[in-house]
Amino acid sequence: KEICFPRLGCFSDDAPWAGIAQRPL
């Protein structure tokens, strides 16, 4: 599964930073 951001692009949700996906940048 991947998470996509308009400004950041797409990343795997198993990446180390995945926890940020649940928080506003």
UniProtKB/Swiss-Prot annotation:
GO molecular function: all-trans-retinyl-palmitate hydrolase, all-trans-retinol forming activity; triacylglycerol lipase activity
Cystines in this chain: 4-10
Record's keyword terms, sorted: Disulfide bond, Hydrolase, Lipid degradation, Lipid metabolism, Secreted
UniProt-listed InterPro entries: Lipase_panc
Catalytic activity: a triacylglycerol + H2O = a diacylglycerol + a fatty acid + H(+); 1,2,3-tributanoylglycerol + H2O = dibutanoylglycerol + butanoate + H(+); 1,2,3-tri-(9Z-octadecenoyl)-glycerol + H2O = di-(9Z)-octadecenoylglycerol + (9Z)-octadecenoate + H(+); all-trans-retinyl hexadecanoate + H2O = all-trans-retinol + hexadecanoate + H(+)
Compartment(s) of residence: Secreted
Record keyword Lipid metabolism present: yes
Enzyme class, UniProt record, top EC level: hydrolase
Record's GO cellular component terms: extracellular region
Quaternary context: Forms a 1:1 stoichiometric complex with (pro)colipase/CLPS.
Family: Belongs to the AB hydrolase superfamily. Lipase family.
Function: Plays an important role in fat metabolism. It preferentially splits the esters of long-chain fatty acids at positions 1 and 3, producing mainly 2-monoacylglycerol and free fatty acids, and shows considerably higher activity against insoluble emulsified substrates than against soluble ones.
Protein name, entry field: Pancreatic triacylglycerol lipase
Organism: Felis catus
Lineage start: Eukaryota, Metazoa, Chordata, Craniata, Vertebrata
